[in-house]
Amino acid sequence: TVNTSYFTNELAMKPDFQMQYGNGFNQNFGWFFSNWGPSFDEGGPAGWGRQNAINGTVSGQPGFLKHPYNSNLNARFLARDLLPLIGLSMDSLWEWKPYDSVGDLFQPGEIVNTNINFRGQSDDGKVSYNVNYGNLDDKGFTPGNTLRRNALSFGGRAVLSNKITVNGTLNYTATDFKTPPIAAAYSSGSSDSSLYGNVFYTPRSVGIAQLPYAHPITGASIYYRSSNGIQHPLWTVNNTGDAQMTHRLFGGVSAQYDISDNLNLRYSYGYDVYSEDNTSYQNKGGVDGSLETQSG
């Protein structure tokens, strides 16, 4: 027999983010990690129409900024002649609007579970066997979060002619689990990496999915923050992680001798062998995390 099941999973809920204000402080624009900048409306006391960086005075197009990667501060970590290598130029602009960075990052995951079973017995019913193979492929809504498991099991029973009954089972599982760092974090870089910690405070005017995350030459993290002070969440996904590989072999055998209908002798032997390899890593090129951005 073959059985297959398919499920999806998704982020249960996310904060009720405001979608009215973007980067900055005191209704003034700046490439910070705050949401106290100008409004996404052009008019009014806090409107972007009062901001030279957004109203077209600097960018040449109202409602647009110069792209964060071609700003003067960011030229120190991303030379301007390298911009074409990531699809940008000195004329690239950034639209002043609310972005759904959390929704863009956490996409629905999927779970596929497949089981194949063979079983049979002899004509007289004294010998029977069972073989089962299972495969689980679980991709979470967090990018880079996966669990894959293969399981194989054998079982059998034989009633011998000399009043002895033998039973045996053999089970093997291999589990491969991978995830980016997702625990609570208190800084913005490599010393305390956390995908969740570096995503949920993202300003509304920053789109994570729309910003390249890796330096075209060194592979280091690049991001919108002035002087590159925050590690790009997508760089975290692709360059950091925790991995666990588990192998387990277990089962047992038993033999029973029937002395009479009401009396028997039984011998059982069981075994369970387990190994686990754990790896935590981060590639070279992360941000030093000098900005404290408490999350969690």
Predicted segments with their positions:
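A beta-strand signature from Gram-negative outer-membrane beta-barrel systems
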Residues: 1-3, 111-115, 128, 132-139
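Surface-exposed loop/interface segments of Gram-negative outer-membrane beta-barrel transport/assembly proteins
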Residues: 3-95, 140-145, 151, 155-248, ...
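Outer-membrane beta-barrel initiation region
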Residues: 104-109, 120-122
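Outer-membrane beta-barrel channels and translocator barrels
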Residues: 111, 123-125, 159-161, 258-260
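Residues on the lipid-exposed face of transmembrane beta-strands in outer-membrane beta-barrel proteins
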Residues: 116-120, 154-158, 251-257
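Repeated loop/turn-to-beta-strand initiation elements of outer-membrane beta-barrel proteins
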Residues: 124-129, 163-166, 262-265
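Outer membrane beta-barrel translocator domains of Type V secretion systems
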Residues: 125, 132, 155-157
